[in-house]
């Protein structure tokens, strides 16, 4: 089966994050088991009670504890698609580009990995190899976190599939989210002294957060764009009517820490700002809930995996600022590199696509990596 045919079958399976991914995992298990691989599933239920499944397919070892030389990692879920995109689940080719939901992010990589392993004579494997297929990457890398928490896998090297236009990415920023809630006291807006505005309190805190965001620019890594930890207040909600003093205001805080900077570092700065506001206003009522706290990752320039991918692509390893499952693979012991066909800038949009030439080239590159580390 060609890589294009495999991608067409993967795209035809609706695996939007809000649904169970059991169907696509069943397909992947059948494909790998037919080649003599051992497929082990790790089911769990998300916060809505929907069944999700991670899977690790292993070759070269029968040990119960999965320890491998190289792991190829791809997430099976996709973002939703607009109903007007009627061909979202049917792979279509135009101008040497393959269109379909997930074609770029990240079913193209999965198709390339499946095609690459079909070339392997398992009898010649000298070191174990794994394919790792995860759920819920698009909603917080939850599947990969399940695997890391369960110590389901140990790997020396890992290629984490994401659309990087076939440029190896050896370092990435972390991704963190928190919700901050401020409470005041409702009252008629004509009589401000009778209430306390939660929105005014939020505004004071947001201003302090803006100052912190500027201060974070002092610590920089030139390889990143932008080269500092970014901080954003993306959502803010408060009040119930124009003539009522707001009793509550909440906002979402997002930050992307540089590798080497603890994800919790910024939390300490925010909490210090909150405590300072409380010292100035005894009624300052504020709570902070951490939603996601993922550290950045960095694999050394002289890593054998980095050097190999630089050699076969003739491109210097770079860095990324978007979230991936590389930090979870690093937790499981791997020197991780993010890599795959397609461009992140066309992911998540209607008419997402992967260039056919890149898809085919990815098969060759993954084959080279398998040959280098496992054969």
What is each model feature region?
Residues 76, 97, 132-139, 163-166, ...:
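Acidic, glycine-rich active-site loops and adjacent beta-strand->loop/helix elements
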